[in-house]
Design a protein with these regions (language model features):
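A short, structured surface patch at a secondary-structure boundary
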Residues: 55-113, 118, 122-126
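Bacterial N-terminal signal peptides
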Residues: 7-17
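Pocket-lining segment of extracytoplasmic ligand-binding domains
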Residues: 235-249, 255-279
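Structured C-terminal subdomain patch of bacterial secreted/periplasmic proteins
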Residues: 23, 153-167, 180, 268-368
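Extracytoplasmic ligand-binding site segments that recognize negatively charged/polar headgroups
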Residues: 74-82, 123-133, 148-161, 197-224, ...
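Alpha-helical, coiled-coil/dimerization segments enriched in small aliphatic residues
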Residues: 216-242
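Short helix-initiation/N-cap motifs at beta->coil->alpha
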Residues: 33-35, 97-107, 239-247
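Bacterial Sec-exported substrate-binding components of ABC uptake systems
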Residues: 18-57, 173-206, 336-368
Length: 368
């Protein structure tokens, strides 16, 4: 037997010994994030994304998520052009994917013309009148609609939502691996806080700080839940879960021990710039300017240097595990000194991400 033949036989043996990727059987009926039963007739090949941010979720379980798209909304491209640019560098075909809406509205005519076999909507879209109309329209034209939720109760729902996407898109192995990874890191935070029940600091989370007016504070929902998981206390917990406007007097009276600002790259809605593609020094400098106003500068949080910033759109993507770890490190450094979101991001990039995520997604006024 020649060496070439022996090598071929050995290669064939090794390939046969590898476990086959588990295949999903279609038609497939699933329960989506709104509790709706949805039947998907066949493996989706032409997907409509009601929110462009859900491309991030697809990119964690599929090596070429853009190849799945029949059409998508332009909200990620518009709100976070830097993260869009990263996808365009890796997958130039994204430039040719038709836009079907802006994340708030959906063009029914465009959706119908694209001959999609699945639509994925975000929970906040499906909860609106326009979203319900879109679901009804798409389903009447034969396009099944699956609703996903990375926003409401994200700490409890994100892993299950990834598993849902994995089943629907025939990527269960990859989705389950990410969900297990996510669950393990959230469990570490919960377990350690349970072992240290003493209360953490008081916190203000200020969405898109604006020197012209004050202030939109996160409540206990969305990213606000990431305060509570650390055992810390949100000064805006009496507001509706989504948060709301608060006055200077309210903040000064509460005098929070920690201040966290949220924003987007380029300071789209405020002067503070943080998120994909942002240099850490730019993020730190713009955060420093955001707390220069006299009333913020007088707060205990600012006086003590406990000022931090975070990419606001963590509330739309399964990367929110990074926000949870950043909050743990910032708010309870005494029990989370070994938790490092930078290392977690590196592992996500190495193990899961079709497009690596880079930039200053979180920042502290004081460099480590």
């Amino acid at each position: 037997m020649t060496m070439r033949l022996l090598s071929l036989l050995l290669a064939a043996f090794l390939l046969a010994a590898l476990p086959a990727r588990a295949e999903v059987a279609y038609p497939l009926t699933v329960t989506d994030s709104l509790g709706r039963e949805v039947t998907v007739p066949a493996e989706p090949k032409a997907v409509l994304l009601g929110s462009g941010f859900n491309l991030v979720a697809l990119s964690l379980i599929h090596p070429d998520p853009v190849s799945l798209l029949a059409g998508w909304a332009g909200d990620m491209k518009g709100d976070n052009p830097e993260i869009y640019a990263r996808f365009r560098e890796k997958f130039p075909a994204i430039e040719d994917v038709p836009i079907i809406g802006d994340g708030v509205t959906v063009s029914f005519e465009a959706a119908l013309s694209l001959k999609a076999d699945l639509a994925i909507l975000a929970n906040w879209q499906a909860d609106s009148d326009l979203g319900r109309q879109a679901i009804d329209y798409l389903e009447r034209t034969g396009v099944p609609v699956v609703v996903v939720d990375f926003n409401n109760d994200a700490l409890d729902n994100t892993a299950d939502t990834m598993r849902l996407l994995g089943r629907v898109l025939n990527r269960e192995e990859q989705a389950n691996a990410f969900a297990d990874f996510y669950d393990a890191r959230i469990a570490r935070i919960r377990e350690r806080v349970a072992a240290h029940p003493e209360p953490g600091p008081t916190v203000l989370m200020d969405a898109f700080p604006n020197p012209e007016k004050c202030c939109y504070a996160y409540g206990t929902g969305g990213l606000g839940a990431f305060i509570a998981i650390t055992g810390s206390r949100n000064i805006a917990e009496s507001l509706p879960p989504q948060g709301g406007l608060v006055s200077i007097e309210f903040i000064v009276a509460a005098n929070p021990e920690v201040y966290i600002a949220t924003a987007s790259p380029g300071g789209t809605y405020s002067g503070f710039s943080v998120g994909p593609g942002v240099d850490p020094e730019e993020a730190r400098e713009t955060l420093a300017r955001a707390v220069e106003s006299p009333f913020l500068a007088s707060l205990k949080a600012v006086q003590d240097g406990r000022v931090h910033g975070l990419w606001n759109f963590f509330n739309a993507v399964p990367l929110n595990v990074l926000a949870a770890e950043a909050f743990a490190r910032w708010l309870r450094p005494d029990i989370f000194s070994d938790v490092d979101p930078d290392e977690t991001l590196k592992e996500i990039n190495d193990r899961f991400a079709a497009v690596p995520f880079d930039g200053a997604y979180w920042i502290s006024l004081k460099a480590n």
